[in-house]
Structures are given as structure tokens and as C-alpha cells.
């Protein structure tokens, strides 16, 4: 029959049944050994001197990533939700099937890809169901009812 070892008390239990383990874990000796175990663990791990004794501490602690300057300057004028514009004569890398890296320049005999125009928001100047007659000045609109006149 396998014996149960209590890591907190550093003993083998004579009764390895679930009831025997439960009785041991509720005992005074086990609880005090468990408290002492965790207090010792906290003292050893959390109150250690810093690793960089005698040295200057690192400027950027943690997961600081160095900036990759090989990519060039950051792109300017790219709005969120819009793809950056490319020159029309350059095919993006990987767009040509069977040719790794794409082509270095324009393809002879093929017109360049047009650059899409940025979307200009259209502001409505008229309300729905409202027609304005530009030929008559100070005249009521076609859809409005006139309050002047014979009844």
C-alpha cells in the first residue's frame, strides 16, 4: 500500500486513506508546519537582495523591446482604417505568383495600377422631401403649403 508524504510536515502518514489525510490536514501540527513553510518561502524569495549589487540598475526594466531602425522612418499620413499608399509602378512583394520577392520595377506593356483617391465625405445640403426652386426668389417651396390666399 503506498504511503502518503506530507511536504509541510516532512513525514509519511501511517493512514494513507482520504479520511486519514483529511484528519492530518486539520491537525494543529500540520497547520503550524504549513504556516511556517510559507513564511520561510516568502522570506527566501521576496526579501533577497537585488541581483545588480554594485552595478547600476537597468534603465528599462521588464519587457522593453529595442526599436528596429532598419525599417526606416515611421510612416506619416496614414489614417487608421486606411491602407498606406504605394507608388503605382511597384508591385508589392509576394503579389506575383511564381516569382519570389516580386519584380523590381514596372512590367513592360502593362499600365500602372491607379492610386485610389481618398474618400471625401459628402455633407447633405438639403433635407429629405424638400425641393428648392432656384429660379424664383422669395417664393415658397413646392412642397410647402401656403397660409396666404383665399379660403
Swiss-Prot record:
Quaternary structure and partners: U1 snRNP is composed of the 7 core Sm proteins B/B', D1, D2, D3, E, F and G that assemble in a heptameric protein ring on the Sm site of the small nuclear RNA to form the core snRNP, and at least 3 U1 snRNP-specific proteins U1-70K, U1-A and U1-C. U1-C interacts with U1 snRNA and the 5' splice-site region of the pre-mRNA.
Superkingdom of origin: Eukaryota
Family (UniProt): Belongs to the U1 small nuclear ribonucleoprotein C family.
Protein name as annotated: U1 small nuclear ribonucleoprotein C
Entry's Gene Ontology BP terms: mRNA 5'-splice site recognition; spliceosomal snRNP assembly
Function field: Component of the spliceosomal U1 snRNP, which is essential for recognition of the pre-mRNA 5' splice-site and the subsequent assembly of the spliceosome. U1-C is directly involved in initial 5' splice-site recognition for both constitutive and regulated alternative splicing. The interaction with the 5' splice-site seems to precede base-pairing between the pre-mRNA and the U1 snRNA. Stimulates commitment or early (E) complex formation by stabilizing the base pairing of the 5' end of the U1 snRNA and the 5' splice-site region.
SMART domains registered for this protein in UniProt: ZnF_U1
Amino acid at each position: 500500500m503506498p504511503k502518503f508524504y506530507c511536504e509541510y510536515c516532512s513525514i509519511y502518514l501511517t493512514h494513507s486513506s482520504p479520511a486519514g489525510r483529511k484528519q492530518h490536514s486539520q491537525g494543529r501540527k500540520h497547520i503550524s508546519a504549513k504556516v511556517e513553510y510559507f513564511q520561510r518561502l516568502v522570506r527566501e524569495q521576496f526579501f533577497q537582495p537585488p541581483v545588480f549589487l554594485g552595478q547600476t540598475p537597468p534603465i528599462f526594466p521588464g519587457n522593453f523591446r529595442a526599436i528596429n531602425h532598419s525599417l526606416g522612418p515611421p510612416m506619416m499620413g496614414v489614417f487608421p482604417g486606411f491602407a498606406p499608399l504605394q507608388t503605382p509602378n511597384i508591385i508589392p512583394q509576394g503579389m506575383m505568383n511564381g516569382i519570389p520577392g516580386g519584380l523590381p520595377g514596372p512590367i513592360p506593356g502593362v499600365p500602372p495600377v491607379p492610386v485610389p483617391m481618398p474618400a471625401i465625405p459628402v455633407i447633405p445640403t438639403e433635407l429629405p422631401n424638400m425641393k428648392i426652386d432656384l429660379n424664383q426668389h422669395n417664393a415658397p417651396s413646392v412642397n410647402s403649403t401656403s397660409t396666404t390666399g383665399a379660403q
